[in-house]
Amino acid sequence: MIRLTTKQRFPPFVRKVVRDFSQMTVGQEVVEETESVIVIKNLLDLTEIPFENTIKHMFVIAKTMHDDAVTALETRNMSLAEDVVKRDMDVDRLNWLIARQTNMIMQNASLLRKMRISTTLAMHYYIISWIIERIGDHAVRMAENTQPIIYLDLDKKILAAIKKASSLSMENFDRSIISFFNADMKDANRNIESIHSLEAICGEINNMVLKQDTLVAIHVGYIAESVRRAGEYSCDISETVINLLIEKENGPP
């Protein structure tokens, strides 16, 4: 429970911060509010929400955000680009949920038995959650950089290259999550090795935009950068999978 007090009365910005916090977190609700007291309480039993379900939910949201950012650029859909930006809070909320669950587990060993999870696996879930949150952030950057050029006539070759790079990036994302849930070290290694194809295409995009006007060159360059970073973050998930499997194989020290 969080209890906020003041000797006088809360200024409007404090109440806004409290509302924003309640909206961006899972289960945290204002249960008492006066001029000088605000009480926030967790109304959700976090132990009843499996880590696996949350990760899968985050994956679907982040991947859809990425795909929609590219679709918005291709179809000149401003409302879709704006919606991608708004969805970022959904990923942030779920990342916060896993962070809170992990913190609870580290402080109370009995929760490990209740949630049927080890501290090692919980920490790896948290790491993967953070990485997915970063992939969502790059989808937002793609959508934000789409908006200034959305109504311009983008070179078809550049658009095709962005779509190809995006497809490779999300294939990496798919494989990284699959390798995690399947505990597949070989697939995780193959995923890491495949990043070179994505990096090559993103390099080609950066060369293509040199012939474009400054506005297009800048924003397409940022889009390509975020597509590449999403793929690289996916490789980070694969590296996490490998580390987890090695730890399991070696057992406790």
Annotate each predicted stretch with a short phrase.
Residues 1-253:
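Cytosolic, long alpha-helical scaffolding segments
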